């Protein structure tokens, strides 16, 4: 009896198909309609102009240096135009990379990383809008108040009698209807 169970387990485990080491994405074009998003015609619906070149690209240059102190430098270049390089140490790093986009334009990003965080720079990156004038004025007023010893912690302090800064009045004694 044990022999039959043992042989059955061996037979089942040896017949099981091992998972493939290759990633095969799900069929993205399985719709019933022909065309770029449908399943008829063999198109997956996810094609980019340089996709075939990327599949067959090779590494044409690669460098890697690591020192005992923790400093390092690495870089590589591929046959489809992707380039990357980085140098740094335990506390900070700087580097960059470039690639050719779907539109044929080469995009380059340069970055530093360290105590101040990750700081990328590139012409294709969005830029924050300018700070509105009212916000700049409020920030300057906050700096003046802090220099004068006035700190607003966001809490209500009845001992201030409604005054947030010297000379300001919150309507105390004006008949505003709010009395504490």
Curated annotation (Swiss-Prot):
GO molecular function: structural constituent of chitin-based larval cuticle
Any single Pfam family the record assigns to this protein: Chitin_bind_4
Domain Chitin-binding type R&R residues, every copy: 69-129
Secretion signal, residue range per the UniProt entry: 1-15
Composition bias type Gly residues, residue spans: 170-180
Basic and acidic residues compositional bias, start-end: 45-55
Region (Disordered): 23-76, 146-180
GO cellular component terms attached to this protein's record: chitin-based extracellular matrix
Record key words, sorted: Cuticle, Signal
Top-level taxonomic group: Eukaryota
PROSITE patterns for this protein: CHIT_BIND_RR_2
Keyword Cell membrane: no
Protein purpose: Component of the pupal abdominal endocuticle. May have important role in the pharate pupal cuticle structure.
Protein name in UniProt: Pupal cuticle protein 27
